[in-house]
Amino acid sequence: MFNLLKPKGASKRRKIVGRGPGSGLGKTSGRGQKGQKARNTSPRLGFEGGQTPLYRRLPRKGFSNSDYKLEYAIVNLGDIDKKFKDGQVVNYDTLLENKLIKKKNKKIKILSNGKLTKKVSFEVSKISKSAESLVIKIGCTIQLV
């Protein structure tokens, strides 16, 4: 097991360049004669050989409002039904305890996927219309925070 040999040709020998004409890769080291690709460094990303690059030829367009975008943690009624008991309060802290949301999301939106059979009270940011009608039908209370 520990003295097995690799099959012939399994590992290639490293190419050693610039060590005289007898090696086959001496003098120019397989880079050809002169020019940009024969030199030491490669041009930066987006460089077009002195021509005005595409990113400078085209105008800037649009803007992003992503810094101020409100992101809601989405929780389904089915998940709440699995993790909560009758009479419990569904809010940021209890959802975090039950690992239904991640810490970074402060705003919560409830959606109507799944069935809710337990009578719980909600303290959330938003709730969908279909989820609201299902929750009210059961007799749960909703408080928008």
Swiss-Prot record:
SUPFAM superfamilies membership: Ribosomal proteins L15p and L18e
Membrane-spanning segments: none
The keyword Magnesium appears for this protein: no
GO biological process, one term: translation
UniProt key word Ribosomal protein: yes
Region (Disordered): 1-52
Xref: Gene3D superfamilies: 3.100.10.10
Gly residues composition bias: residue spans: 19-33
InterPro entries: Ribosomal_uL15 (IPR030878), Ribosomal_uL15/eL18 (IPR021131), Ribosomal_uL15/eL18_sf (IPR036227), Ribosomal_uL15_bac-type (IPR005749), Ribosomal_uL15_CS (IPR001196)
Entry-linked PROSITE patterns: RIBOSOMAL_L15
GO cellular component: cytosolic large ribosomal subunit
Alphabetical UniProt keywords: Ribonucleoprotein, Ribosomal protein, RNA-binding, rRNA-binding
Entry's Gene Ontology molecular function annotations: rRNA binding; structural constituent of ribosome
UniProt record similarity statement: Belongs to the universal ribosomal protein uL15 family.
Subunit organization: Part of the 50S ribosomal subunit.
Function of the protein: Binds to the 23S rRNA.
Protein name according to UniProt: Large ribosomal subunit protein uL15
Organism: Borreliella burgdorferi (strain ATCC 35210 / DSM 4680 / CIP 102532 / B31) (Borrelia burgdorferi)
